[in-house]
Each structure stands twice: as C-alpha cells, then as structure tokens.
C-alpha cells in the first residue's frame, strides 16, 4: 500500500491525457464541497429525541450551528499545513488521508449523535472532518496546476467550481437520504385524547402502564416535520427512564 501511494507512483507516463485530471479533481471537490450544505442537518439535530419536534433534552440550534464553523476553521488550518506535506508525500498519500479523515469524521460525528454527546459531533465532523476537507482541497488544486502550467487560472477555477458546486449537489442528496431513512415515532393521538403528565419540564403519557416521555406537535410544528404527519402526541425516540420511573 505504501508503494502504491508513494510520490513516485503518481508520476504519469508522457502520453497521459491531462484532461482526465480535471474530472477527478472536480469530483473530489464536489464531495468535500457538500460541507456548505450543513444547514440541512441543523433541524434534525435539534430533534434527535423528539424526532418530530424538539424534546426537553434535545440540542438547541445555537449548540449545533457552530459545528460548521469549526469544520471551516479546521479546513483552513489543515490546508495551510498540508501544502508542505503535499510537496514531500505527493497527492495520492494526502488524498487518501483526506478521505479517511472526511469519512471518519462522519462516523465519529454519527457516534456523537447516537450517544447524544455533542463534543463527539464537534470532534468528528468539525475537527477530524474539517482536517479531511483541508487536505482534500489542496491536493486536487496543486495537481491541476502542475498539469496545466499554461492555464493556471483555468485549473484553479475548475477546482473552485467543484468546491462551490458541492452544496448544489449535496443539498438535495442530503434531503433525500434524511427523508428516506426517516422513521416516524409512535403516534398516541390528539393532545385532547391523551392524559399528559408534566414533570421537571418534560411531558409524559401512560403507554401500556408505563410513563413515557412525549412531545406535543401543534399546527406550527407540523410544518417543520421532516415528513408531514398529524397534530398530536408522539412518543420520544429516547426517553429519560429516571424521570419516568419517579
């Protein structure tokens, strides 16, 4: 593997068609440019527990919106330091590390969502993923410029076009996957038909003899649901058992 990623192995033969390089470079930048579609994640992240609307223990919008900022700052810092390493190691090695960081950042961030640990989301998507963004940004740009010394402006423009276009492609893709894998929580009925108990700022309803935390969706919240559903009472995806057992 080390030999395959070495700088020497990335030297193309003399008859290589240089117009293949922009295609790969733009594709890479389209992928990492999807970071600009981060805002699609904000609403679902504020209702991880409630799913249809925010529950008492869900993250606030102000708590999750800064993940994007951390990712962009990490991008800039990584790009600044990756340039020198790129000259020494070559684009293949830098590109593979970038892919591992970008993909690994998603995995760590997903673990943070699953365990409801906000710091893991910041570490994964913000820091690790951001480092992957930075290294993934400089590698195609540097390679393009080397292949097009006579058209440096055009080469840089193609790479930036891909990075900027990432949001255009990433936004509908992310919306599609969010809707595809969306699972509506259990619906208990209209708020007037369910016996609700409020404790410590949380709402509970008796389900099969057990108090379970619920959220109440009104006309305003219905408009913000990932997939439209009826107004009423929904069981939280995860609920605080300690409060329910009191």
Predicted features along the sequence, with ranges:
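Conserved small/polar residues in nucleotide/adenosyl-binding loops
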Residues: 239-244
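Cytosolic juxtamembrane N-terminal segment immediately preceding the first transmembrane helix
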Residues: 2-27
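C-terminal ends and interior cores of transmembrane alpha-helices
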Residues: 101-114
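Conserved MFS/SLC helix-loop-helix module at the cytosolic interface between two early adjacent transmembrane helices
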Residues: 79-99
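Intracellular juxtamembrane helix-capping segments at the cytosolic ends
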Residues: 45, 135-148
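Central cavity-lining transmembrane alpha-helices of secondary-active solute carriers
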Residues: 66-83
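Hydrophobic core of transmembrane alpha-helices in multi-pass small-molecule transporters
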Residues: 118-134
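A gly/Pro-rich, aromatic-decorated transmembrane alpha-helix motif that marks the paired
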Residues: 161-187
């Amino acid at each position: 593997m080390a030999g395959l990623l070495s700088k020497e192995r990335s030297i193309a033969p003399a008859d290589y068609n240089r117009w293949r390089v922009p295609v790969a470079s733009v594709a890479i930048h389209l992928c990492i440019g999807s970071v600009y579609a981060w805002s699609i994640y904000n609403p679902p992240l504020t209702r991880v527990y409630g799913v249809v609307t925010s529950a008492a223990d869900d993250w606030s919008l102000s708590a999750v919106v800064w993940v994007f900022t951390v990712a962009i700052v990490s991008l800039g810092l990584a790009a600044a330091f990756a340039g020198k390493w790129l000259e020494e190691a070559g684009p293949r090695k830098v590109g593979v590390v970038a892919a591992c960081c970008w993909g690994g950042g998603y995995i760590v961030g997903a673990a943070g969502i699953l365990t409801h640990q906000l710091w893991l989301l910041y570490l994964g998507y913000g820091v690790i993923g951001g480092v992957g963004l930075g290294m993934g940004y400089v590698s195609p740009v540097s390679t393009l410029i080397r292949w097009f010394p006579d058209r440096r402006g055009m080469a840089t423009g193609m790479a930036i076009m891909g990075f900027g276009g990432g949001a255009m492609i990433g936004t509908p893709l992310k919306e599609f996957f969010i809707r595809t894998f969306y699972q509506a929580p259990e619906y208990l009925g209209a708020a007037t038909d369910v016996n609700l108990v409020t404790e410590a700022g949380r709402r509970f309803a008796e389900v099969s003899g057990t108090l379970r935390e619920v959220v109440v969706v009104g006309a305003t919240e219905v408009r913000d649901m990932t997939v439209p559903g009826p107004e009423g009472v929904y069981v939280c995806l995860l609920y605080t058992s300690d409060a329910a057992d009191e």
